[in-house]
Amino acid sequence: MSKIEPHAARIRAFRADQNGTAAIEFAIIAPVLFFTLLSLVELGVLGMMTSALDNAVVEVSRRIRTGGADAATSASSFEDQICDRMGGAITGCRDRLTISVQKFSAFSSAGAAASAPPAGQFDKGGANDIVLVKADYRWPLMTPFVATAYNRDGPLEVTIAARAAFKNEPFQ
């Protein structure tokens, strides 16, 4: 018997032992799996926030459209109403929300202005005026993968935009 045979027998026994292989495979796959799950959850929350902002803008804009927004309605109270309808549990909503309410003479000019970010104007117009309500909400992201999907190189946040264009009713 040579000196190599006992070592070769131990090496063969070591290679034949399959204990712990699943743990090693899981350790390799786990970070990718958890990162993917976190990204999916974040995309779901982002979709929910987009829907919440759209619905809040439509609901609050209805008060302008029907003449229910009195002269005391200001940009800050309008922001408060949007934040309340988005869900009161969102902290810092007012700091992350930017709105703009503008009146136009034609829908074509309102459509051209819809792509620009809100600049803070607040002119709800009068009866039969065409009004464009713009709201942008800066949503913080948790995963850089989602930020990359939105082509963001800077801070981990994405801007959720909601627009509502309408003609005011002939209110008094």
Language-model region placement:
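Alpha-helical assembly-interface signal, strongest on the long, hydrophobic N-terminal helix that forms
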Residues: 1-84
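Short, conserved structural patches
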Residues: 2-3, 59-172
